[in-house]
Amino acid sequence: MGQLTTFDLTNWIEIYNLKMYFETGTGEGVSLSHAASYEFDQLFSVDIDGDLIDSSKQKFIENKKINLLHNYSVEAISEILPTLDKDKNILFFLDAHFPGADFNKISYEESLRQFGKNSIPLQEELATIMSLRDVSNDVFIIDDLMLYEEGDFEYIRQGGIWKHKELQKELNLITESNFIYDMFKDTHECIKDFRHQGYLIITPKKGN
């Protein structure tokens, strides 16, 4: 589980004229708090864990720019994106993996079994986003890249192991990264960041 705090967003906001922030996976509000320190017009954060949403509502009660959504990420995307100004570029931080598990409410195995495709919703999130808006000027940061491909990830170097690949196969929840690169090959550049469990930073190609 990484955090948006890993990144200084200033250059991306300026270069790509980013006006809104949308994250999947509120967690304890750490990444949202970081995003809120920048001058976004609006910020959206979605989590299926009602307790985490309620906690963040209290934490950010004074910030009227922040919108907290208790829902599955794909459903929230489908609900909110059509209401947003299509001319305002968005920074997406996609981190809605394994509901309940990162905060020790349930195990990762239980999360995979209980939530199924909603435990690893990235492909459906991206497909839904791209069906609802022209993303050619939007920026995406995808967390937990190590779930989707091999690499020299900091988490692995420090002895971390993802133990549930066989369970993913059993549940037909296999993850790979080809779909990401295929989706963005015409419009964006993809840069890998191997800190923590890995990030994929997806920025518009020049001339978009």
Regions inferred by a protein language model and the residue ranges of each:
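A short alpha-helical cap/connector motif
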Residues: 1-91, 97-208
